[in-house]
Amino acid sequence: MGFRLPGIRKTLSARNEASSKVLDAPKGYLAVYVGENMKRFVIPVSHLNQPLFQDLLSQAEEEFGYDHPMGGLTIPCSEDLFQHITSCLSAQ
């Protein structure tokens, strides 16, 4: 009795693609992790150029350097503050 490796590979590949699509941010957006619970937010990349958001990036650099524990960009502030900042940026 043998195994059909091409079929197994195809199944595993499809599962990996499906799971990575759930975690990917849409084109033009970036996933960041915020707060003590590391809640995931997906924000427009245009926020990265805003001075208010650049202050958050500076804080992240001071606290984490380039070693982010979640593997993505981690922002060291409360979820409430982050939501307030992103709503202000979206209103501009």
From Swiss-Prot:
One of the GO BP terms on file: response to auxin
Entries under Pfam families matching the protein: Auxin_inducible
Induction: By auxin and cycloheximide.
Entry's family note: Belongs to the ARG7 family.
Protein name: Indole-3-acetic acid-induced protein ARG7
